[in-house]
Amino acid sequence: MEHEVGMDADISDFTLGADGYVRIWSTEAIYNTGNPEYANKPKQLASMSNHSGTIHTVRFSPNGKYLASGADDKIVCIYTLDANPPSHASTFGSNEAPPVENWRTIRRLIGHDNDVQDLGWSYDSSILVSVGLDSKVVVWSGHTFEKLKTLSIHQSHVKGITFDPANKYFATASDDRTVRIFRFTSPSPNSTAHDQMNNFVLEHTISAPFQNSPLTAYFRRCSWSPDGMHIAAANAVNGPVSSVAIINRGSWDGDINLIGHEAPVEVCAFSPRLYSSQPVSKSAVDNQNHAMQNVTVIACAGGDKSLSIWITSNPRPIVVAQEMAAKSISDLAWSPDGKCLFATALDGTILAVRFEDGELGYPMAMEENEKSLTKFGTNRRGAGIAETTDGLLLEEKSKAGEIKDVEGRMGALMGDGHATAESMVNGKTAPLPSNGATPARGPSPAADTQKAQPNGTAATPAAPEPEKPDPYQAKLERLKQRPTYTKDGKKRIAPLLVSGAGAAESSLPQARLMASVSSQVKADVPQSIVDLSKPFDGLPKGGLSALLFGNKRKLAQLEGDEDGHVEKRVALASQNGATPILANTPDGLLPAQPQPAPTGQQPTPEFIRPAVTNPCMAISQLRLAVPKVRSQIVRAIDSNGRPTEPPSATGEPGKSRADVVFEARNPSPASLTGRAVDREPVRLTLFRGEQPLWQDFLPRTVLLVTGNQSMWSAACEDGSVYIWSPAGRRLVSALVLEAQPVILECNGPWILCISAVGMCYVWNVKHLSSPHPPISLQPVLDAAIHTLGAHPSAAPAITNARINSEGRVVVALSNGEGYSYSPSMYTWQRVSEAWWAVGSQYWNSTEAPVGNLQSAGPQQDKETTAAVSAGIIPFLERNTTNETLLRGRAYFLQRLIKVLLSREGYESFESSVSIAHMENRLAAALSLGAKEEFRLYLSMYAKRLGAEGLKMKVEELLKGLIGGLFEEEDETGTGRRLQANEKEDRNWQESSDTLCGWPREVLLKEVILALGKHRDLQRVTVPYAKLLGVVDNESEDNDAMET
């Protein structure tokens, strides 16, 4: 019983799988069966019986080096041809001819739990994929035959596998009535399962052509066309009729069906060549050197024992051969020249079908196949050969560093604490606790030295307040000690999964704003919700005519008032000189109803009135919402200087963690003297607990307050801003703005104030200066687009505006975009947008890893209380994700990208967008000075460049990292000097020894080791490795990744 046939790439051999035997035959002898000269030449070259069951599939590797076979003994065997002649004669007890070729079994691959049904090699022979009745798709390395990944995606038996000739996808067919497309990148010869963790991902699932397909077929062998455009999927149905579905690449839809077989089609096979309808000549070549009218040929067979040959230029089969065997045809294989087709059947029949020139067409040269695949960005890079021993040593160190890195991460995830392990806490090293315990955070230096005292003097550093006991940790301890009793009455302590209980922080080192998902969510919630009034518009609804003549509303329609008595009564009262009192409702105007007089104690209103807007807003192209005038405005900070919830008005201060509270009380609108301008002043008070530390008064209504341990500030309704020291001393005269303030934030000595016309002001209280002139938000809010119309239109809203510890303004918008202002370039920079969210493979890929990075260079400055710009980029990207999903924009962008991927010229779209996203992240981290994120993004970017083999970008990256590290110092002093608004080590090309806070040598060594395993890049990386001493110094520590 024959199940499988496979062809070798050199046309000289083909192989068959039978009951426990793999037989290799000579095609030359078969082609010349009628020639007397070949009568004595052997047809069977070898026979191997390494399987203990029926063999279902055999496949030659495209490079002709290996042969793979799979059987119902759950084993995949790998054979290779030995140049030495076979050492044995014919098998004892058999009548077979002695073997001519010596095929040795070099590997037995164990990974399936049931029969192996089909095998497939990638076109560059880099991977082997096996599928079976255990519903598994197992990916093996084509070089080392190590198991790279197991895909348990299908829900039933998998019975077919085919590879994309462009080496981008492979497709599997299953009895769950689906064909699934997997995207992959060819692994390097020394890749491991860890390297390929994010490789081999599901791209698409196709189910429509197979919804009612029968489950009785032995196989579902599909095939990919040689031009990469189509997949022929067996065992499809078109209504009640069996068919072969032709699936289009990119869109993955099947609108073409090959109908004619009376039973389910079990096997399809495209010819490996492209054909022309006329003999190939120079006249048949167009201006772009492409042969014209290329067609493909496909053979189909199955349970009806018939064979059909189809050609894409003909809607009907050109050949139909019936009753080819006594049982179902199980497999088909074309010769590499496309002139012969081999078939096997379940009754043991082996068929060879020869075609004369012109019957199918005229085969094109293989170069034409390559030309047709170039539009898909074919990835046929060879294994590569290490040219020097330095390259091999660099490759070995790269792999050793990756293994140690994996072990370190796994140990951290499992909560392994070591006495020698250290983590960074506020720039200082602290022992890393074990069992997931969280180290107590030391007090901030600012909290020790700048706490305000009643007499205005600085106090001595106080001991940090003890952390409150974690209730989850206490509950966890109780659960650990909970006893259980066995049937015989013995007491046992029940085991507990420690990592899944409680809410204690991880033992991994954390960066600010990236401690955990819960802390990130809490950090994004504003400390208080400000009741905002509607933005002021220069013209009322209805335009200029409404401004001049008014825009009168109609009275609401009342039940029982069809004759309009209410409207007539209002009109009559107006004629008599009276002013009717009407209530403005959504349905229209209604006569006002008398209200009973209020009795008892009245609650203090949350807001008193809307703020009076500045007349300049009438001509401004940008108008932001202005906060209403509230009766009480409170800002509270804890002992570490962080904003916190103020004490509640119910008199329960014990629930608040506030250390100092800054309060502004606006007076009631009532006048003291009868004149409207003679009102009570605003009272500002700083409290610690119940004790007031200092008090001040302002003659203007306060809209916003902010503050920290360095200063306190209040913004007033007339656009003036006041600043006090922690002791209550006014640091500057009132700062006057052009409009009302709408946002007031602070961070350390920096204050950010945004006015109602979109002007951003940044001040440094310590130096009484500003890093740049006032900047407008119009570029950020797309003012250039929204002001093109005749009337003002709605623009994206500001959902968050913050300032970092370097005075950099960061703005998040309601359309999902995030911006930061660059003081060195005097312009806004777009850090995050929805385009990356739907187009990049790296979206949402940094939140956990960033917290896992430890400092690899010199210790941070002891005065640094937190990492500069830490978490800003993930914060903006989270806002992009939330806003995009909230507004449904992601659905339309995904549809756009899906359409683009199916169009010609966009085959490398996803890869290009992913690399561009990493470059945008890297540039943003460097500009903001986000040290930890920069190192992580650099590592991810280098690994992607190595996987893609982009030599030019790799060489440019290495040159940028090395900078002026090994250049001689300029003794003449004519080197480039930094401008006043520039930061050191924020430029790739400058000659500083550090880059974004990291020593350039450390970053360069990490990138070199990440790229060292790619042999096709070793001509670029080995010289840098020698320069750094990575491969020359044999006595250095083998742990090259540890710095």
From Swiss-Prot:
UniProt name for this protein: Protein hir1
One Pfam family hit: HIRA_B
Keyword terms, alphabetized: Chromatin regulator, Nucleus, Repeat, Repressor, Transcription, Transcription regulation, WD repeat
Role summary: Required for replication-independent chromatin assembly and for the periodic repression of histone gene transcription during the cell cycle.
Gene: hir1
Family matches, as InterPro entries: CAF1B_HIR1_beta-prop (IPR055410), HIR1-like (IPR031120), HIRA-like_C (IPR011494), HIRA_B_motif (IPR019015), WD40/YVTN_repeat-like_dom_sf (IPR015943), WD40_repeat_dom_sf (IPR036322), WD40_rpt (IPR001680)
Taxonomic source organism: Aspergillus fumigatus (strain ATCC MYA-4609 / CBS 101355 / FGSC A1100 / Af293)
Gene3D superfamilies found in the cross-reference section: YVTN repeat-like/Quinoprotein amine dehydrogenase
Compartments it resides in: Nucleus
Spans of repeat WD: 1-35, 50-89, 111-150, 153-192, 214-257, 260-320, 324-365
